Amino acid sequence: MAINIMAAFEETPPPLDFVFNGFLAGTVGALVAPGATGKSFLALEAAFAVAGGVGADLLGVTPKHTGKVAYFAGEDPENVLITRLHSLGHHIDPAARENVAHSLILEPVMGNRINIMDEATIAALVKGCADCRLIVFDTLSRIHQLDENSNGDMARLVGVLEYIAKTTGAAILYLHHVNKGSARDGQTDQ
């Protein structure tokens, strides 16, 4: 449906719903960096902040509202994830630990061959994440079977992520590696 331009001119819009500064609910964002630079730890800490609130905000991202977080970890096995949780848990207060334990779903999906382009997978994600504030996919390459060098394939993939974000109202954060050539040549913005 088209925007009513006159209404937009005349009526005060509702406040924007930021999950954390600069990241709107219902949108898709990316954390892109070379491998082994801490993307997963950073994303997990952001998930802690949203799930646990002030006492779990190790990054200082100050989420406006807490909420449920679904984190799909495709590159690390369960024992590594448990080690990270144990380590981070020492840095948050007991009440925040309870909030994180209640509101964070950390799903190890390494080796599960997820294909987010599959309609049944999309439907399951929309249903399972309907009450989420944040959804994290770590990493993008582990949730599809498309050609990452194809602009068309990647546009379709981002379209699916946008659909899930719009349908659930959650912000979606995906982690992605820059290609090896770009990282080697110092062109990490590629």
Per-range role (PLM):
Residues 1-19:
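N-terminal pre-Walker A segment at the start of P-loop NTPase domains
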Residues 14, 19, 54, 62-152, ...:
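Conserved inter-motif catalytic segment of the P-loop NTP-binding fold
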Residues 22:
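Walker A/P-loop-proximal flanking segment of P-loop NTPase domains
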Residues 25-29, 67-68:
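Pre-Walker A (Motif I) flank of P-loop NTPase domains
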Residues 30-32, 36, 40-41, 72, ...:
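Phosphate-binding/switch region of NTP-binding enzymes
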Residues 42, 46:
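Hydrophobic positions on the alpha1 helix immediately C-terminal to the Walker A/P-loop
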Residues 51:
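Gly/Ala-rich phosphate-binding loop of Rossmann-like dinucleotide-binding domains
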